[in-house]
Amino acid sequence: MLLLQSILITKIMVIQLILFFEYALASGFEDKNILKEGKMMFDTLLKQFLEIDKVISLLYKDFVDNYIDFKNLEIVKIKKENEIENKLKSLLKSENIDYALVVAPEDEDILYNLTKIIESYPVKNLGCSSEAIKIAGNKYLTYLAIKDAVKTPKTFPPKKYVVKKIDSCGGKFNLFDENFLIQEFIDGENLSVSLIVGKKIHPLSLNRQYIDKRGFVGGEVNINHKLKDKIFNEAIKAVKCINGLNGYVGVDVIVNNDGIYIIEINPRITTTIYGLKTNPSLAELLIKNANNEELKFKVKGEKFTIDK
């Protein structure tokens, strides 16, 4: 009996150290809309991780005071954006970190580079592999990866294109370089699928996306839909096309009378988690997934809006 108590106490006292940060809040990103979405994602997961154990996070100097009183949160202050990679390496070298998760954009290989750093240390990455980010973070490479498995908009290779009016005169045109690609416009319902990807692929929820001329302005999480199972199946087929997707993955979908179109695969945490309520929490599911444990969960969803 005493031996059993000792084992239980030892198990309870094991501290798990989680490195978690969101790039906009760590870099002091100037775009207020990006910061707002970044904070929504960060705050949601931070509270969940802190319910599990101790968290270390990188925060830009202007935001530190907002989190200074959080129990079990260790803050590493960032003064300039170019400090982030070195601070991350230093933490991974000096701290006994068990798990790491970075929320960052795919732009300019930011998420890819930060993930490569995490992968070079003996910690469990709760997110996607750098290999998967390299593909899913590039819209054309994603198209090439999934086009034979699922419906997706016709997409042309990224190269220089000229766009001009059919009946214009005077040589007026717009020139687009290799940073742009041309893709067929698909009209229909803007939806997304939230999944956890590991040894199995678990769809968490089907979500409605609110999109207007300002961009993504909110959503409704865990909706019912007559095609829900079929949409889940198409999202799973797309995810299977890219090796190394792991943890939380978001798949953007458009549904119309012609079928179910896979638009993008997001190899990272998305703003949708703000309205996603799982039991156990998403943070706990990510850790269980990293440890190859069987996942059992219940899902509820909420509507949310982003004031832009």
Swiss-Prot record:
Function: Catalyzes the formation of an amide bond between tyramine and the gamma carboxy group of L-glutamate. The enzyme also accepts phenylethylamine in vitro.
Annotated ranges, domain ATP-grasp: 89-291
Transmembrane spans: none
Record keywords: ATP-binding, Ligase, Magnesium, Manganese, Metal-binding, Nucleotide-binding
Reaction catalysed by this enzyme: tyramine + L-glutamate + ATP = gamma-L-glutamyltyramine + ADP + phosphate + H(+)
UniProt superkingdom: Archaea
Residue positions binding Mg(2+) 2: E264, N266
UniProt name for this protein: Tyramine--L-glutamate ligase
Xref: InterPro entries: ATP-grasp, ATP-grasp_PylC-type, MfnD, MfnD_preATP-grasp, Tyramine-Glutamate_Synthase
Pathway given in the UniProt record: Cofactor biosynthesis; methanofuran biosynthesis
Residue numbers binding Mn(2+) 2: E264, N266
Cofactors that this protein relies on: Mg(2+); Mn(2+)
Key word Metal-binding present: yes
Gene3D superfamilies: 2.30.36.100, 3.40.50.11770, ATP-grasp fold, B domain (3.30.470.20)
Residues reported in the UniProt entry to bind Mg(2+) 1: D252, E264
Cofactor: binding details: Binds 2 magnesium or manganese ions per subunit.
Gene that this sequence comes from: mfnD
GO molecular function: ATP binding; ligase activity; metal ion binding
One Pfam short name: ATP-grasp_3
Positions that bind Mn(2+) 1: D252, E264
